[in-house]
Amino acid sequence: MQQQQFDQLTTAEKREVERQLHLYMDGAEEVIPPEELRAKLAKSILTGEPLKIKLGLDPSAPDVHLGHTVVLNKLRQFQENGHIVQLLIGDFTGKIGDPTGKSAARKQLTDEEVRRNAETYFQQFGKVLDQNKVELHYNSKWLKRLTLEDVIELAGKITVARLMERDDFEERIAMQKPISLHEFFYPLMQGYDSVVLDSDIELGGTDQHFNVLMGRHFQEKYGKEKQVVILMPLLEGLDGIEKMSKSKNNYIGIDEDPHEMFGKTMSLPDSLMKKYIHLATDLEAEEKKRLVKDLETGAVHPRDAKMLLGKTIVNMYHGSKAAEAAEQQFKKVFQQNSAPDNITAVHWQGGGTVPVTDLLVTLELLPSKSEARRMIQNGGVKINGAKAESIHADIALEHGMIIQVGKRKFVKLQMHQ
């Protein structure tokens, strides 16, 4: 049947199928299975019906960072080719919490937390997707209506052995850590979402392999055509080791200040440059290849490639003017050893002298005195451009004093009597 549909297409239509197939598979870690993706594209062109592309979101951590955009950029490719984007907010499943990669049970969210996080998600996604061309769904709409009889029927369509194939469940059993019964229902409900939405394709990161395959499993059990699964690579964070995550503080948020975004990009390990060029930018494919080749041959210095990468990323989320300003400020601060033009003013009542560690903590430049001492000992604190040498120093406060912590944090003291 799949080949018959493809054979019915004109030569131009077949070329269009292959163009889209190449586009969607480019950069993907895995497509399950590729031949079904080709067949779905052929059917879409033959019937004129767009495909329905699902992305499920667990609204437990609503701040969107570059790691999320790897999947979002792929979703945008489908959107730009006329297909339907189904953004599924797991407001019901979010109360359970996805156990993927967790060595312990997760805290359940309240209705208000889920709603607030979902709104934040959608607002930030507008920087990547056309919000006017997105179907927004909340799975509480159908999951809340399930009766106990429905739930038992759903549970009867999968075995415990199949659910135990999850690596995280196996690890928790081996470590003698508890698994609550309700956690087994997360993949069941995620799979059932695909049944209700009748999704043709589901996107996810490679860490979602088990969950997104549940959609195929349950669609087949309910007599529907199985969705294709497209898994995108995970983007390592600024530490170059762990997956990008706000909780690990190794992230670049798409809502961050342009200067901070640019500075963080410049701190990337050289080893991540190629991956970020491929997955985190909107550069044309040929430009990506050329830049990567120049890096490999030494035709371009990693620092200069990072400057282009930083400017490209800031431009994507804040526009060209902000990107240009961020680049110029970075050059001024780090290459010319000057303070930035726009320094945050902090207010101080009174005057006199203050221990340097107290000053840094009071101004919330560092979270604790121990952190302040460590930063001073590592040469990371400057007062009016001069390095703070002693953790026991008393600082004579003055109006307009510039305090620098680390490479990118500057404040200017505003004195009030």
Swiss-Prot record:
<dbReference type="GO" id="GO:0006437">
    <property type="term" value="P:tyrosyl-tRNA aminoacylation"/>
</dbReference>
<dbReference type="InterPro" id="IPR014729">
    <property type="entry name" value="Rossmann-like_a/b/a_fold"/>
</dbReference>
<feature type="domain" description="S4 RNA-binding">
    <location>
        <begin position="354"/>
        <end position="415"/>
    </location>
</feature>
<feature type="binding site">
    <location>
        <position position="246"/>
    </location>
    <ligand>
        <name>ATP</name>
    </ligand>
</feature>
<dbReference type="Pfam" id="PF22421">
    <property type="entry name" value="SYY_C-terminal"/>
</dbReference>
<keyword id="KW-0648">Protein biosynthesis</keyword>
<protein>
    <recommendedName>
        <fullName>Tyrosine--tRNA ligase 2</fullName>
        <ecNumber>6.1.1.1</ecNumber>
    </recommendedName>
</protein>
<dbReference type="InterPro" id="IPR036986">
    <property type="entry name" value="S4_RNA-bd_sf"/>
</dbReference>
<keyword id="KW-0963">Cytoplasm</keyword>
<keyword id="KW-0436">Ligase</keyword>
<keyword id="KW-0694">RNA-binding</keyword>
<keyword id="KW-0030">Aminoacyl-tRNA synthetase</keyword>
<comment type="function">
    <text>Catalyzes the attachment of tyrosine to tRNA(Tyr) in a two-step reaction: tyrosine is first activated by ATP to form Tyr-AMP and then transferred to the acceptor end of tRNA(Tyr).</text>
</comment>
<keyword id="KW-0547">Nucleotide-binding</keyword>
<dbReference type="InterPro" id="IPR002942">
    <property type="entry name" value="S4_RNA-bd"/>
</dbReference>
<dbReference type="InterPro" id="IPR002307">
    <property type="entry name" value="Tyr-tRNA-ligase"/>
</dbReference>
<comment type="similarity">
    <text>Belongs to the class-I aminoacyl-tRNA synthetase family. TyrS type 2 subfamily.</text>
</comment>
<dbReference type="GO" id="GO:0003723">
    <property type="term" value="F:RNA binding"/>
</dbReference>
<dbReference type="GO" id="GO:0005829">
    <property type="term" value="C:cytosol"/>
</dbReference>
<dbReference type="GO" id="GO:0004831">
    <property type="term" value="F:tyrosine-tRNA ligase activity"/>
</dbReference>
<dbReference type="GO" id="GO:0005524">
    <property type="term" value="F:ATP binding"/>
</dbReference>
<dbReference type="InterPro" id="IPR001412">
    <property type="entry name" value="aa-tRNA-synth_I_CS"/>
</dbReference>
<dbReference type="InterPro" id="IPR002305">
    <property type="entry name" value="aa-tRNA-synth_Ic"/>
</dbReference>
<keyword id="KW-0067">ATP-binding</keyword>
<dbReference type="InterPro" id="IPR054608">
    <property type="entry name" value="SYY-like_C"/>
</dbReference>
<feature type="short sequence motif" description="'HIGH' region">
    <location>
        <begin position="59"/>
        <end position="68"/>
    </location>
</feature>
<dbReference type="Pfam" id="PF00579">
    <property type="entry name" value="tRNA-synt_1b"/>
</dbReference>
<dbReference type="InterPro" id="IPR024088">
    <property type="entry name" value="Tyr-tRNA-ligase_bac-type"/>
</dbReference>
<dbReference type="InterPro" id="IPR024108">
    <property type="entry name" value="Tyr-tRNA-ligase_bac_2"/>
</dbReference>
<comment type="subunit">
    <text>Homodimer.</text>
</comment>
<feature type="short sequence motif" description="'KMSKS' region">
    <location>
        <begin position="243"/>
        <end position="247"/>
    </location>
</feature>
